[in-house]
A protein has these predicted regions:
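C-terminal binding/interaction regions
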Residues: 2-20, 25-26, 49, 75-79, ...
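Short beta-strand elements
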Residues: 30, 35-45
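Short, thiol/selenol-centered motifs that function as redox-active sites or metal-ligating centers
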Residues: 33, 55-64, 102
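Short alpha-helix boundary/capping segments
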Residues: 52-60, 72, 98
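Alpha-helical support elements that line or immediately flank enzyme active sites
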Residues: 63-75
């Protein structure tokens, strides 16, 4: 059974779609289950000004993508780097152990996008 918070993020996902002129874009796929998440973000004054996601996969994958975008909006890269899987799992009201990979996939995609922000000369947008 899923929590009310998780179901709300699944049924009413926030910050969906792509950003035009994104500062970073990252897309990851879980090769085991096939879940895919794509994040695009814009920075302003060292903070995430806008973030959007697209996800294809299980209920937790979509809910975690939605919750993550709310968690990181207007946060600095340093603040975001301190987020852990358990923080995202708590934000969706918990996940079954078998679904914790959904939270990790969203965080890994975000980490890849942040790597692009921190190393713009060496990183290339992923998933294009």
């Amino acid at each position: 059974m899923y929590s009310p918070q998780l179901l709300d993020h699944f049924q009413n996902p926030r910050n969906t779609g792509d950003l035009s002129n994104a500062d970073a874009v990252a897309e990851l796929e879980n090769p085991v289950c096939g879940d895919v998440i794509r994040l695009s973000l814009k920075m302003q004054a060292q903070r995430i000004e806008k973030i959007r996601f697209k996800a294809k996969g299980c209920v937790p994958a979509i809910a975690c993508g939605s919750a993550l975008t709310e968690m990181v909006l207007d946060k600095t890269v340093n603040e975001i780097r301190r987020l852990r899987r358990d923080d995202l799992i708590a934000a969706v009201g918990g996940l079954p152990q078998a679904s914790s990979h959904a939270a990790q996939l969203a965080l890994d995609a975000l980490s890849n996008a942040l790597d692009q922000i921190e190393s713009p000369r060496s990183a290339k947008p992923q998933g294009n």
